[in-house]
């Protein structure tokens, strides 16, 4: 397996958009299908899934995966952290599509304080929080959430 740096991943994404050509939303859909496939081959549809998403493209990926897993019969609870009320274009498109299809077990858009759901060893957490673009230490509520997730017994799939 080749492990790429954040800069290499962004460069490959841009190369694909420039040379295939493919719209960034379609590239996100393609990546989300691959993530969904990886999850469905490893986890039964009876496990509870909790998705944490931020307003950027990692969150857009996570929301698309939420939709796709729900279409396959998985029980998904999705949480989108939209504290500042601004989403990336692709995140907004995936949020709107997720809400309009109405297949997820629950969808919550967090705009202020947040009490995380209980995570057990049966839970699969899909981490659509921050990826390779994060260039500073986490602080505040996100630092607490990541600590909570990491200290849980849940299984975790991180998206980037």
Where are these regions (language model features)?
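Glycine-rich phosphate/dinucleotide-binding loop and adjoining beta-alpha-beta core of small-molecule
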Residues: 2-4, 43-159
